[in-house]
Amino acid sequence: MNQSLLSEFGDPLARVEAALAALRAGRGVLVADDEDRENEGDLIFAAQTMTNEQMAMMIRECSGIVCLCLTDERVRQLALPMMVEANSSHYQTAFTVTIEAAQGVTTGVSAADRITTIRAAIADGAKPSDLHRPGHVFPLRARTGGVLTRRGHTEATVDLMQLAGLKPFGVLCELTKEDGSMARLPDLVAFGRLHQMPVLTIEDLVQYRQLLSERSA
C-alpha cells in the first residue's frame, strides 16, 4: 500500500482513531484493502446512524450493491441462510440471502426504503419475521475474530463499529469512478479530501488491533 498517498491522514494508528471519531459523529469513512487483494476501497457508515442522505450518496457514488455487515450472532438471530451452500467466490465473501423490511417500505429500492430495511435488521429485538426475502439489501456475515482472522471489508466494518463503541453493524459499498470502474487508493484519497472523510486501510486496522492485544496481554 502506498503510504505516501495516505500521509495527509496521519500514521496508521492516527488514521484508525480518526475513523473511529468520524463514525461516532455519524460520518462516513473510506477503507482500502491490500493492493494484492481486491485493491478496492469501500465507503462505510455505521448502520445505527446512517441517514437517508448518506444512503443516497452511497447509491450515487458507489457500485449500487449496498451491503449490511452483520455479526454471525445477528445472522443466526435473523435466521438468514447463506446465499449459496458452497461458496466458490475468490475471497469467500459471505453473502446471505438478500433482505427487505416487512413493514414500512414500498419497492424497497429507494434510499429511504433501504434505511428502513437496515434499521429493521439491526433493531435490538429483531426477529426473522421482521424481514422479507429476497430484497434490495445484501447482508454479509463477518467472520469471528475480525480482521485478525480475515482481512476483508466485512470484518473491517464490524471491527470499526465495535472499536467505536457502536452496534457491531455497518453498511458498505465499493466506491466507483464516474466511468463505472473501481476506485483505487488515489481516488479514495481524493474523495476523502472532497467530502472530509478519513481514509484508512485494513492493514492499519490490523496493526491497531494487534497493538491493543499487546497492551492488554
UniProtKB/Swiss-Prot annotation:
InterPro entries: DHBP_synth_RibB-like_a/b_dom, DHBP_synthase_RibB
Keywords: Lyase, Magnesium, Manganese, Metal-binding, Riboflavin biosynthesis
Co-factor requirement: Mg(2+); Mn(2+)
Residues that coordinate or bind D-ribulose 5-phosphate: 37-38, 42, 150-154, 174
Record carries keyword Cytoplasm: no
Reactions it catalyzes: D-ribulose 5-phosphate = (2S)-2-hydroxy-3-oxobutyl phosphate + formate + H(+)
A molecular-function term among this protein's GO annotations: magnesium ion binding
Binding site for Mg(2+) 2: 38, 153
Function: Catalyzes the conversion of D-ribulose 5-phosphate to formate and 3,4-dihydroxy-2-butanone 4-phosphate.
HAMAP family: RibB
Protein name, as recorded: 3,4-dihydroxy-2-butanone 4-phosphate synthase
Species annotation: Aeromonas salmonicida (strain A449)
